[in-house]
């Protein structure tokens, strides 16, 4: 039987040495929301708790300023 190889999750922000996650960096924030607009949990992305809190805050600010949508386009 073949064993399933699970890739080790790592925090991208720790590896890059990011101090603060900026709400204006839409390209980065889009990687951490689903197609329906939900914030992806850290157990899936591998983000550390400190950066997950900053990420959630940045996404919520970007939504408030209409830089990111709250939900997907309902058609």
From Swiss-Prot:
GO terms for molecular function: small ribosomal subunit rRNA binding; structural constituent of ribosome. This is Small ribosomal subunit protein bS18. The gene is rpsR. Binds as a heterodimer with protein bS6 to the central domain of the 16S rRNA, where it helps stabilize the platform of the 30S subunit. Belongs to the bacterial ribosomal protein bS18 family. GO terms for biological process: translation. Keywords: Ribonucleoprotein, Ribosomal protein, RNA-binding, rRNA-binding. HAMAP family: Ribosomal_bS18 (MF_00270).
């Amino acid at each position: 039987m073949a064993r399933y190889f699970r890739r080790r999750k790592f925090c991208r922000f720790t590896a890059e040495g990011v101090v603060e996650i900026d709400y204006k960096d839409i390209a980065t924030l889009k990687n951490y929301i689903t197609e329906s607009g939900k914030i992806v949990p850290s157990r899936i992305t591998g983000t550390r708790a400190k950066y997950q809190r900053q990420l959630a805050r940045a996404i919520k600010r970007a939504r408030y300023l209409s830089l990111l949508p709250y939900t997907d386009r309902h058609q």
